[in-house]
Amino acid sequence: MLINGVKRMEKINMRQYFDYESCAYSYLLFDPCNNKSILIDPVLEKFDRDMGIIKKLDLDLIGILETHVHADHITGAFTIRKSTGVPIYYGSQSGVRGADFILNDGDCIQVGQFEIKTIHTPGHTKGCVSYYTCGMLFTGDTLFIGGTGRTDFQDGDAGTLYDSVTKKLFQYPEDTQVYPAHNYSGEMKTTIGEEKKWNPNVGDSIDKESFVEAEKLKNRPYPKHFDTAVPANMQCGRVSNK
């Protein structure tokens, strides 16, 4: 079965992990037939946890996929690469230094017998991407469970974010599972159908102009670790003294 040009397979394993400090999700995907695996959005402070899980499951880690330059925590990508030698992938508009591979819209990463498709979804930042495979969308900070990422820093743009969600992500089947990079209330996943129906920011009843105006009225403090996280993440998570 083909979904937006990607072969949909049923046997892909996915594990979801949480960092309580940043309320950030990381995802481990692996092919159960040959144990090829990738990490999406690892968190630096969870390096030991992530490497321990990969070792325990006897997985062959072949890549680290980032959805965007995070502003609230430092990615574990640089440290994992330093330890394992696996490559780091970012979207082509992210502006990061030191990534091994830059992904254009529609590019696919082969992991064992399945493909992960890159979808450029700018708006939260200009370099945001989402990833699709096997009926699952990993949406970073573009689409949340009942919300969307903020658009008031890192070259964010509300109109662009609205288009990324409604013209790209909402084109996937309604039963597509959505896994975001954050949740602050304990929810773990949603579906495209649920977000189209109920998302208060970008659901079917909200037009683009209303969303843009609502974003202008929001006044939120920057993330606590913004001043350290962004410079490090512009270098794939490299901390200046390492």
Model-assigned labels for residue ranges:
Residues 2-4, 163-177, 181-242:
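Accessory terminal helices/loops
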Residues 16, 28, 108-136:
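Core dinuclear metal-dependent hydrolase active-site scaffold
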Residues 29, 41, 68, 80, ...:
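Divalent metal-coordination and catalytic microenvironments
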Residues 42-43, 69, 93-94, 124-125, ...:
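Active-site metal-binding loops of divalent metal-dependent hydrolases
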